[in-house]
Structures are given as C-alpha cells and as structure tokens.
C-alpha cells in the first residue's frame, strides 16, 4: 500500500532553515515535495516575491507548482504523452541547471506572454509545465468553489451576452474545456473586482494568451485521459 501511495501521491517535507546549515529550497525530487516553512510567513514571502519580481506568490501556489513536477513524471513521461508534450512545451532534455542559470541572469524573453502563463515558465519545459499545471489547479478549484455557491456570470453567447451558471469542473460528465475557458475570464474579473472593493490587490494578476490556453488545454486533456483510464 505504501508503494502504491508513493506512486500516485507525493510526499511532503516542511523544513526550516537552521543556523549554519544549508538553505532549504522549495522543490520536488524523487516523489517528495519540500517546502521552506519561511514561505508561510507573510512578510518573508512578500520580500521574496518582490526580490524575484513576481506578481503572485503563495504557499498554495508553491504546492501546486511542485505537484506539477510530480505528476509530469506519472502523467506525461509514464503516460505516453512525451511527444505531444515536447511539441507544445519544448524538449525537457535541455540542460536544466544551465537553463535556470540563464533565466536568472537574462530574464524572460520580451514576448514571453504569447506562449506562457508566467515569466518563470520560460526557464525550461519542466517549469513551463509546472507553472501551467498550477494555473490549471487554480482554475478548476476557483470554478468549483464558485459553482458550489451557485454563482452566475454574464458571458458571450450566440445571441449576445447571456447569464450562465458557473460549471463544476469535477461534475460527471465533465464540462467541455471551452466552457471552463469561457467562464474563467469573467470569474477572475469578478474576483479581482471584489478584492479591489476591499482595498486588496488582485487575487489573480494574470492575463492569459491563446498560446498559454493551448498549454492549459493540454494539461486538461492529460488529466481527463488519466481519469478515464
């Protein structure tokens, strides 16, 4: 049972920096997701976000990103989707350490938003997948919550703007991906507007391009394929 759990579910290690010891780095290796507990401190997390010029940094975001590395091995590498992955995200056999060093030295390309969900996603195909995976989890979680509260949105329809109930992405049968896309933009606009009404920053400070949506669709299709097998 333990081996089966390790195959399909990641393990977690919440560690803290110790005086004189090595720095604890958030990451994934060998099925274990390591998180530095300093990321749970609001002030420290904000400091790191500003230092790295990130628009969004949360503990939940870290968990979702690192789980993407875990599930890439199981759903893409072991799931027979490597060729399709490489056609869309690039070749993950590129030198990972060199790619990250180049990213931190030079930054993302100026047109990064055309094909990526975030600037960090440009660093390497593995990071592109993990960032896209995290955004997909953000999307389905927020849509599911909105659906549970019977939220209705005004969305474009065949005869103009129509009122539409938010779909539950975990319903059976699952709603089409295009439905999730159609509802995502107005839902995040609503969410951000509610935050601004209370003097808070945008909860979802991203604008996704058609290229980024193609990658999100790949994640969705990968999850649906695994769920039905």
Locations of regions flagged by a protein language model:
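Active-site-proximal structural scaffolding
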Residues: 28, 56, 60-64, 123-126, ...
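Post-HExxH zinc-binding segment in Zn-dependent metallohydrolases
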Residues: 72-143
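Auxiliary, metal-adjacent structural segments of Zn-dependent hydrolase domains
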Residues: 1-42
